[in-house]
Structure formats: C-alpha cells, structure tokens
C-alpha cells in the first residue's frame, strides 16, 4: 500500500511550503476549506472534477481524509487546489519494493475567478516537479473528462503524453456516461524536458 503523501514527503526531507514562480503550495488544512468551498461548490468547477461536494464540511473531511491535497496561493489569496496521490505501481508476482510509491496521479482545480492567468499550467508544472524531484516517483498520470479542453491543454503544455481516450468510461453526475482521457509522463521525460528549456 502506498505511503500517505505527507508521510512520504517528510521521509524524503521535503519542507513546505513548495514554491513555484507565482504560486505557493501547502498541505490542505481545515482552515482552507471556506475559501476552497467558495469555488468548488460552483457547477462550473465540480462538473469537471471527481464530484460535487455536499457541503463545506464534507469537502473539508474529504480532503483531510484523502491527505493528498495541496492548497495553492498567489500571494495571500487561495487560487486553487492541487492533488498528488502517490500509488504503488502494479508489479507482476505481487508487491515488490521497487514498485512501492513509484507513481502518482496529479490533478488541479483553479478558482474560475482566477482563470486566464496561467495558474493551471504553473500548478501542473509544480506538481510534476514535486512528484518527480521531491517524492522520487518514476511515472505521473493525469486524468480528465475528454471534453475538458482547458485541462487537456494544460497537460499538453507541460509535456505530458496522451496515452488514451476511453469511451464512456466515467459516470458523470448529470451527463451520464462520458469519455475520459489519460495523460502521463515518466521521470526521464520530465528531466529531459528541463534540459531542453
């Protein structure tokens, strides 16, 4: 079973906050819930994420329980939430040590009031750097509904590879069965892309 994010980060000597060019990332705390709820409760947000939170308290408990969310600030303003869910890779013949904590799923949600400023792309790059450089995973995936053009553009901008579009693989709350898209990147690809910049 994968190591919880904050425990893995601590074991690797990671100190928060994480800093990107304009953004600061910290582990989600209960005190962050009101600001995050203010945008996650909007249909224009939850219709593109993993679900509709029933209340601010439900969002708080879900995020704290998952332990994989990072609050994203520009200055003192909460502008979004990032996700880094570390996972064990599948390994033939059962669990093997080199498969432990070997991959991660990343995700992002940006407050629509902050859209159009490049925060999504900056956040995705920061999450990739955190996963590869700080946590030491070898593979990162990101998933989205196939018609979520803004997220797909972000994945492409940061150099993630489109690995597949899957017909009607996700049951949406209001739209029924919808297609999903998966993008991924290997640590070697990430480090190679840095040398080309």
Label for each model-derived stretch:
Residues 1-44, 69, 73-197:
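Acyl-donor (CoA/ACP) binding surface of acyl/acetyltransferases
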Residues 52-74:
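Active-site rim helix/loop that mediates acceptor-substrate recognition in acyltransferases
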């Amino acid at each position: 079973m994968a190591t919880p994010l904050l425990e893995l980060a601590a074991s690797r000597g990671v100190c928060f906050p994480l800093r990107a060019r304009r953004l600061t990332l910290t582990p989600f705390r209960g005190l962050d819930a009101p600001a995050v709820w203010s945008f996650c409760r909007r249909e224009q947000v939850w219709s593109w994420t993993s679900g509709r939170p029933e209340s601010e308290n439900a969002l708080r408990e879900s995020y704290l329980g998952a332990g994989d969310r990072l609050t994203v600030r520009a200055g003192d303003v909460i502008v979004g939430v990032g996700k880094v869910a570390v996972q064990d890779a599948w390994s033939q013949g059962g669990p093997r040590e080199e498969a432990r904590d070997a991959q991660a799923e990343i995700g992002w949600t940006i407050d629509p009031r902050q859209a159009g400023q490049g925060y999504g792309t900056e956040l995705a790059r920061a999450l990739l750097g955190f996963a590869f450089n700080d946590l030491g995973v070898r593979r990162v995936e990101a998933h989205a509904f196939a018609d979520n053009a803004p997220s797909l553009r972000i994945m492409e901008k940061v150099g993630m590879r489109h690995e597949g579009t899957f017909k009607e693989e996700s049951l949406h709350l209001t739209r029924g069965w919808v297609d999903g898209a998966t993008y991924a990147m290997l640590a070697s690809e990430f480090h190679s892309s840095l040398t080309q910049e």
